[in-house]
């Protein structure tokens, strides 16, 4: 009997393959930021979902978190362009963690779908090595929507799969345990 291979959060984040957006379930008492430890060389940017209730607020929060250039136009096309560029933020890959994601565009499913499409387009461009910055190589780009189990029920359709943040033992990796000195 062969062991079932389970994709860990770390191996998922290092991958330059879809899915580009995933739902990260945060347990009571946990902070989303504590669940995501970016692999070496990958940039982790935290976007506050509570600040993304309308498209205008979402654009402002992304501009703040990702330090968009002054020319950012605060519209969907400009967001898509900046997410596929990021030359001012050099890294081997990108992880966007949206905390309190149940608050992202809660009253407009059409705008929410547009937002997801833009994130997936950016992920695909980076994953195919077609993003700006002359990447020419597949680059990880993932967006984690962090919600509690209770908040998850607030949106009927998230449009993405859940990813497990629980530590998973990978085949061939031995965990170091602290030695006890007597």
Predicted regions and their residues:
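Short, structured protein-protein interaction patches enriched in aromatics and acidic/basic residues
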Residues: 80-110
């Amino acid at each position: 009997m062969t062991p079932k291979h389970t994709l860990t959060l770390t191996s998922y984040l290092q991958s330059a393959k879809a899915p580009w957006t995933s739902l990260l379930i945060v347990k009571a008492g946990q902070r989303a930021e504590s669940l995501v430890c970016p692999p070496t060389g990958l940039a982790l940017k935290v976007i506050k979902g509570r600040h993304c209730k309308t498209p205008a607020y979402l654009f402002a929060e992304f501009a703040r978190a990702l330090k968009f250039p002054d020319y950012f136009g605060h519209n969907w096309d400009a967001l898509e362009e900046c997410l596929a560029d990021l030359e001012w933020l050099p890294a081997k890959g990108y992880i966007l963690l949206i905390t309190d994601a149940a608050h992202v565009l809660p009253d407009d499913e059409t705008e929410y779908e547009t937002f997801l499409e833009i994130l997936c387009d950016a992920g695909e461009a980076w994953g195919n090595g077609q993003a700006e910055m002359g990447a020419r190589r597949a680059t990880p780009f993932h967006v984690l929507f962090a919600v509690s189990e209770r908040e998850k029920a607030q949106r009927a359709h998230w449009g993405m799969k859940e990813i497990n943040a629980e530590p998973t033992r990978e085949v061939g990796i031995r965990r170091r345990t602290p030695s006890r000195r007597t």
